[in-house]
Swiss-Prot record:
Keywords: Coiled coil, Cytoplasm, Golgi apparatus, Membrane. It comes from Brugia malayi (Filarial nematode worm). Positive regulator of amino acid starvation-induced autophagy. Belongs to the SCOC family. It comes from the Eukaryota. InterPro entries: SCOC. It is found in: Golgi apparatus membrane; Golgi apparatus, trans-Golgi network; Cytoplasm, Cytosol. This is Short coiled-coil protein homolog.
Length: 122
């Protein structure tokens, strides 16, 4: 019984292969087109029409996303401005502290260049 089923399946496959050999290919110029268009030029495929509600929902979603991104950009811009101001303030304070340290070092005897002292004779 199993052998008969396999034989039937094999014979069906060879028949299908033989039938597909008879179909004209696009590149075959010798055979004419077997598709009857009724004298009309077929139109290219068009996308399926979408529901108006789907379009409105998509538009509303995109608008809310754009507004959210604009708000985020606004927040980031304000943050950049405040960080710039903080940076300028810290840079100015660093300059003041640097000058203060230089003044302290100049007035302290510890940081003065060592002067060679001649031995005192009595």
């Amino acid at each position: 019984m199993v052998e008969i089923n396999c034989f039937r399946l094999m014979s069906t496959d060879t028949t299908v292969t033989n039938e597909t050999d008879n179909f004209p290919l696009v590149d075959d110029e010798s055979q004419g087109s077997s598709i009857d268009t009724g004298g009309r030029i077929p139109r290219p495929a068009q996308p399926l029409p979408r529901d108006e509600s789907d379009d409105q929902e998509e538009k509303a979603r995109l608008i809310s996303q754009v507004l959210e991104l604009q708000n985020t950009l606004d927040d980031l811009s304000q943050r950049v401005d405040s960080v710039k101001e903080e940076s300028l303030k810290l840079r100015s304070e660093n300059q003041v502290l640097g000058q203060y340290i230089q003044n302290l070092m100049a007035s302290s005897a510890v940081f003065q260049p060592a002067q060679s002292k001649a031995p005192q004779t009595k």
